[in-house]
Structure formats: C-alpha cells, structure tokens
Amino acid sequence: KKSGLLGISGVSSDKRDVEEAAAAGNKRAQLASDMLNYQIKKTVGAYIAAMGGVDAIVFTGGIGEHDAIARAKVCHHMDWLGIRIDTEKNEHPVGDVCDITAWGAKVRTLVIATDEELMIARDTKEVVEK
C-alpha cells in the first residue's frame, strides 16, 4: 500500500502529484520521479538491445502521453542510439499522433493519444459476442 511512487515520495502514487511536489522542492518526490524515469529508460534500452535496434519509440498511455518531463528524461543521453527529441514538440505535442523527433535523429519518437474507454468498449463487445 505504501510502495512505489507513494512509498518513495511520501506524497502520492500519482506521478502528476509527485512531479508537482518535486517542482516545489520536495527531495523525496524528486528521487521517486528520477527512479521511475531511470527504470523506464533502462527498460527501453534493454528492449532496444534485445531487438538489435529500433525504427521508432512510441510514448502512449497516461505517463507516456501526458508527461513531457518523463519523455525528456527517458530520451536524455540516448543520442548514441539515434534517439533525440525536439524540446518544443515534446513540451507541446499536437494531434493524436505527434512526431517529437529532433532533426537528424535516426530513431523516430512519437507521442500517440490513447482512448482507453474505446478499448474497454471494444473488449467488452468482443467478450459479450462470444
């Protein structure tokens, strides 16, 4: 009940609340945010290595779609893998599919909007029709 973001930050299990507290100077919240972003970055790197490279990285869902700070931290220092994002595009993504790739980067980086309610409705319909 008090693990993960809440356990480390002492603030909340919601990353938005943790980021707000970190921005206000809460060191535990900053640590929690840094640890989560590091774990995401480590996982992305592991998958890139396992696949022998990638053509694109997609950020979607709650954090991926709405957290420019997380996207920036995950992609930071990944230039050597061909990943570099445009700061302005990252901070202000436009449309359901937004390419935030920086000019000259070899790997495309996209932010794609999700419609979780639609997915739940489709899955429910599929189950009911079986």
State where each predicted segment sits.
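Adenine-nucleotide phosphate-binding core of ATP-dependent small-molecule kinases
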Residues: 4-8, 15-50
